Amino acid sequence: MTNPLQVSELVQYVKRELENDSLLQQVQVVGEVSNFKRHSSGHLYFTLKDEQSRMKAVMFARDASRVKTDIRDGARVIITARISVYVASGEMQLYVERMMEDGVGALYEAYVQLKEDVEARGWFEAEQKLPLPAFPQKIGIVTSPKGAALHDIATTLRRRYPQAAIVFAPVLVQGKEAAPQIVRAIEWMNEHQACDVMIIGRGGGSIEELWAFNEMPVVTAIHQSRIPIVSAVGHETDFTIADFVADVRAATPTAAAELVTPEAAELAKRLNELNRRLTRHYAQYITERKDQVQRLATSYGLKSPRVLLGLKQERLDRAEMGLNRIGKQVLQSKQQALTDQVNRFARIAMQERLAEQGRQLVRTRKQLERIHTVLRTKQDRLHQMIARLDSVSPTQVMLRGYTYVEQDGRLVRSVTELSDQTFRVQFHDGSILAKREDEEDGNRTIL
């Protein structure tokens, strides 16, 4: 006869056998909760029973913190647990790792499995996401025609960005036919390039009601879409696989509409600021050119000789008037263009309009540069003509040693024109008085 076992030895033996059985280390059990207690430490203690048996169960605080449902006596739950023995009492006990209400358990397990599979494919990664367009012209909506989500999205779009066209694809958002309809709507939007960005969503609901957005065909269609997609499924606390795969996740349908649209009032404010800056720029440019023309008009080179001043002053005046006229025309043209763009704001994307403004600014700047080049050429020619006139002016000739004679205010061109009276000899730096004296041989000498 073998030696009898101590009670503790037997309990330890049973404990080891249970813990060495891999099947019993992760088993799913369904039953009704009774004797439920939540300890101050966060641990949960309860009994799991059915009509024939019952077992004690414990769920430690770390695992209990992940339970999203309200557990209470009488609740029917599905648990994932390991089986062991509580040595002090020798009782077999369930050590619970996960727990959910029965009825959603299978769906939740499927959700977790699909989420892990899709995440492993890299579909959640940021580099897989498409950027949202800054100024969409067409916005697609895929949702139920009867739900509040459509009203919330459409109302927000019309308020914030009324110039965008709305392309609506009505679908079921729950039930067996929901997923195929959602897939077809996404594919249709892509095939026809029907919109620049797409909102897919519905209002809140249970996991069963939101399940269409956890099905693989819908998830795949979202991932393969060439059009950026904003997911707006349920409320802020609801998450579906579609939310993780979509390019952007919005907490609510209203938030989705705000994400895909700029604020029209802010855009108008920015446009007005650009208009003011453009007007200020051209006004400053015209003022600088006018000052330059004034400096040229009052320069020494244009004052002497007077004949040249008269000719060139007229040309400069015309050039100044032409520059002013062109400047005013440019400003009026740009102001009118900006006004026209504001009026066409409902039809043209802001980004394209700003780009066209930039191109118009470049063209105008080149035109003003050409005007500046013409003025500079005219100024160079003016200086050349002044130099040529100076080279033949009397002052320049006298600097080379020549003089001229005046008598009684008249210019004397021949010695025969001189009388016996005094006359004036003009040098470049002054004049002297002289008198004629005739020699006996008939020659005339100036004294």
UniProtKB/Swiss-Prot annotation:
Localisation per UniProt entry: Cytoplasm
Keyword set, alphabetical order: Cytoplasm, Exonuclease, Hydrolase, Nuclease
InterPro entries found in the cross-reference section: Exonuc_VII_L, Exonuc_VII_lsu_C, OB-fold_nuc-bd_dom
Reactions the enzyme catalyzes: Exonucleolytic cleavage in either 5'- to 3'- or 3'- to 5'-direction to yield nucleoside 5'-phosphates
Pfam family, one: Exonuc_VII_L
Enzyme nomenclature, EC number: 3.1.11.6
GO biological process: DNA catabolic process
Cysteines paired by S-S bonds: none
MF-aspect GO terms: exodeoxyribonuclease VII activity; nucleic acid binding
Tree of life domain: Bacteria
Broad class of enzyme this protein falls into: hydrolase
Annotated NCBIfam families: xseA
Protein task: Bidirectionally degrades single-stranded DNA into large acid-insoluble oligonucleotides, which are then degraded further into small acid-soluble oligonucleotides.
Family as reported in the entry's similarity comment: Belongs to the XseA family.
Subunit text: Heterooligomer composed of large and small subunits.
Protein name: Exodeoxyribonuclease 7 large subunit
Organism: Exiguobacterium sibiricum (strain DSM 17290 / CCUG 55495 / CIP 109462 / JCM 13490 / 255-15)
